[in-house]
């Protein structure tokens, strides 16, 4: 995990954004476009969400073809944080193909904290694309959305996601043992987190 030297608490607290923040979209990185979902994405989404290895550590079953339309439709308008528990879900596009998705889910707006998450097509693993997408996700969370802290929860057996959290500079703050009944067995949970001050320091901002 990357070492971060910024103090966790700055004396000057940044101005708080008004509820209803909507980041400018789409977002373009070196190789990716992060954009709202749209009709026509169903086939690409099905290509990864229907895989057992993708949903193994997620609270979801493999996506069925008949449900792909509803899955995409539910995410079409998930582009702003306007109230407690709202979420932003963006398609990750690479060379005109949706290869995954990223998520920001707010808690209480007054706390300025959000959960982040992701899912990617394993066909594209090993090229740094997940890191590229998640890095831009942090820029949205700590930039336009003005979050104070972001966190991710994952099954510790999901080493790919754990390594991604570590590459992002997130630290493991908690490890809960058999705290959830998950897909027929008791499972553990790891919590990773990062503060805005740490994120800015790591970027030299």
For the regions a protein language model found, what residue spans apply to each?
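GNAT-family acyltransferases
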Residues: 1-123, 140, 144, 178-179, ...
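Membrane-interacting alpha-helical segments
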Residues: 98-102, 154-165
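Conserved acetyl-CoA-binding loop-helix of GNAT-fold acetyltransferases
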Residues: 120, 126-143, 159-167
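Conserved GNAT acetyl-CoA-binding A-motif
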Residues: 144-153
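Short, Lys/Arg-enriched C-terminal cap helix and immediately downstream tail that follows
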Residues: 149, 177-178
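Short histidine
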Residues: 154, 161, 173, 185-188
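Conserved acetyl-CoA-binding loop of GNAT-fold acetyltransferases
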Residues: 166-176
